[in-house]
Amino acid sequence: MPILDELHWRGLIHQSTDPKELSEQLAKPTVVYAGFDPTADSLHVGSLLPLMMLRRFQQAGHRPVALVGGATGMIGDPSGKTDERQLLSKESLAANVEGIRKQLGHFLDFTGPNAAVLVNNFDWMQGFSFLD
């Protein structure tokens, strides 16, 4: 069963833009990504749906990319908070990313022809001064 049909069957797609084009794109190997917040060394239940979507896409022959928001995670999400978030140290961030990487390895295959990739936005954003 094509991945798009499976996702519809499971009730995981409410609506999409240009379903015909999407179906054509997903008929060949493509890259999909989901982002994860490394403000803790472990994923939480809110990460389960995007993680399972990455797994399903990988099982269908696509390459999953797990984007860890290391730069944005250092700053934190202030929504719903009255106090300013404390910046994470680079050491804490690295430990959190490593913990998440290990957990992702239980769901995603990081070897093989459509190996999952883990990227960290800290790697390309660390030189920007707004993180200082």
What does each of the following model-derived ranges do?
Residues M1-D132:
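NTP-dependent nucleotidyl-transfer catalytic core
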